[in-house]
């Protein structure tokens, strides 16, 4: 069964900017206008949704903000969703994207390295272990050690011109800077420059 992501980007003027100390949040854009991909890999790192293994998610299941905008609240209430959460631009901009998001080697992901025409290896993105390598993993590391987390840290398997190695994934591996979240983060950063880092946030929930 597939899962879908819903939500609203919200902002508010800097409190006190127009004389009012309490400024309500306003809906800026429905998330679907900026992000529509079923990107389970990034959802696991951000919200611990559709995770294939234990991940130290950044903003898991925080619930909807108490002061959510009326428009976003109506949408969230009308939809029987789950895993409601949110994050501000300040929180997002303080993330160490190079930090590991799992406790040790991933039991699911491996790093794929491709051989260049010159013969050197260049790292590519993360991928699940190809089915063709299951037998090779059993032969190389033992029948009970097919999961990459059970390989030696320097273990590797070859498939054609590609090499697969175990990896402790970083948040940036699961949420690439040029991935589906780029438009969302770009807009949030622009709004934060205008209204302040604490006055821009994304509210999300999931269906399915």
Q: What positions do the PLM features span?
A:
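Acidic (Asp/Glu-rich) sequence patches and key acidic residues
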Residues: 1-196, 207-208
């Amino acid at each position: 069964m597939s899962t879908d992501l819903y939500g609203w980007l919200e902002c508010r003027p800097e409190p006190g900017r127009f004389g009012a100390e309490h400024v309500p949040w306003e809906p800026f854009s429905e998330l679907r206008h900026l992000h529509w991909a079923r990107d389970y890999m990034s959802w696991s790192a951000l919200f611990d949704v559709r995770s294939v293994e234990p991940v130290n998610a950044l903003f898991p299941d925080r619930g909807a903000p108490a002061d959510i905008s009326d428009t976003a609240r109506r949408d969230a209430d009308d939809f029987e969703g789950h895993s409601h959460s949110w994050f501000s631009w300040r929180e997002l901009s303080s993330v160490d994207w190079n930090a590991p998001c799992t406790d040790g080697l991933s039991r699911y992901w491996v790093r794929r390295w491709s051989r260049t025409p010159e013969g050197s290896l260049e790292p590519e993105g993360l991928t699940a272990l190809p089915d063709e390598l299951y037998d090779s993993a059993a032969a190389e590391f033992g029948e009970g050690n097919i999961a990459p987390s059970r390989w030696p840290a320097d273990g590797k398997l070859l498939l054609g011109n590609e090499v697969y190695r175990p990896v402790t994934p970083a948040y940036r591996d699961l949420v690439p800077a040029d991935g589906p979240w780029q438009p969302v983060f770009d807009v949030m950063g622009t709004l934060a420059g205008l209204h302040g880092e604490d006055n821009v946030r994304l509210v999300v929930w999931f269906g399915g």
